[in-house]
Amino acid sequence: MKVTGIASCIVVGLAALAASYPANAQKSKDTLRHTQADNIAVLDQWIDPRPEVEFNSEAAYDSIVGYDDDKGAYVGILAKSWKRVDPRILEFELHENVTWSDGEKFDADDVVYTFNWVLHPETKLRFKEAYTWMEKVEKLGTHKVRIVSKVAIPWDLARLSSQTFILPEHAHGPLKDKQDFGRAPVGTGPYRYIQVDKNTGLIAVKRDTYPQASAAKPAPTIGRLVVTPVGDTGTVTALLLAGQIDIARNIPGDQANMLAGRPELRLTLREAQGTQYLMIDVIARSGKKELTDPRVREAIMAAIDTDPYLTIVYGENMNAKRPAALCSPNMVGCAQSQKFVTHDVARAKRLLAEAGLGAGFEVSISAREGTGKQIAQVMAGQLRAAGIRANIELDTFATYRDKQRDGKLQLLVSGYAGGGLPDVAQLLNFFFAEDPRNYHGRPEFFDLAKRANLEMDPQMRLNLVRQLFDEVTKMHYIVPLIPASNVYVHSKDVKFREGWPSNGYGFTMSEVSWQ
């Protein structure tokens, strides 16, 4: 295994620091310790939808349904069964033996209350539009509800399964300031949070019973969770080496591989639905006319080699693979048959010569700090090897959005987290909505995306998505580069479940166990 000198020095230095801490394995205390980059004052993803809040909320709260990624099927969580009465109506039979973490019983009133609160005109939520497809939610019995959508959509279950956590009417309803709820959360989830502190972190304990356990959300096995806010990778690594935490997320590839060489640590790659991708300005909104020639775009695709991107981001020995399609294979509605261009520098040069650009041309790659910058730096060298003189423009998120809106992106290396849905719908909205992201100039792409997001017949929907993604690939517009996987360095005592991920982190807390 190759490790850079810098990474080696970092690990050696941190190992020396770790020696000053007493190793303190927590398996014997049935306590799993990990860190988060953000300070969390309110554990409620409705109020604060940051990824780390959503991840920890998964342990506290439940959705009506979940998604079994391995089988590609929806399964009940708070619902024990459901039926589609007609294309616009879903009816759910709810579990009758579920309790809230304060001991009160869960019932249909809680479901109706949650969605009525979310949809109320005075409720201000960042992602409220994700639920405006609902027309109404009705109580049909003590443990039966009906959800009616405004129009027939094939992804309603996907939205209901994805961080759509149900709230307790008795605890949430009376609060004038709804942020107070997340400071002392009450949920039906597998863990009960006994501490939510912005400075010291989160503490949760396993619920005594979890009768709604399913393949999408199994019953917990670890007794106690301790989550500490730590903002920098160096401190996280030091705590890991000192035995003060059991899991560390997304330590840089070289460093993670070297840490995993220690006998007390292991390395695990957990895939997620997102991707880092390359987008080309097909219609020269940026004024870069050379990019309108499909031979030039194909040359760019042939010049890039994704293997070094995988290595630099995830390190060696991780077996990370380039995505085979624009969508993840476990997404409902994902379909693509057109293959991506393979790496071939000689072919890239021939294509440029055929396009009258044998002497090459200049192009700008827009990227942001982090993974995007890492990939862009390697990509620029690959393009230069084919005769394309690429320079890198590093953007903040704000400047990137300005450039996107103003038509100033030539090549874009960026990331997309998958939208949090086990369905292709959000991906279609992200890439093919009629907004400033349009650098393709193909009205039929908008039409195909809209039709796919309204088509109720599964096979017809797959055909629409396949047609769209195949055309996108043929015109060399967008191509995925690496998966949005998560690298975990963890104690040898920690075990992740096998199979596909349940969320953007690659696991939920109830899916972790001791070896």
Predicted regions and their residues:
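Surface-exposed binding/hinge segments that line
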Residues: 21, 26-27, 83, 128-171, ...
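Alpha-helical secondary-structure segments
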Residues: 33, 107-114, 142-148, 189-190, ...
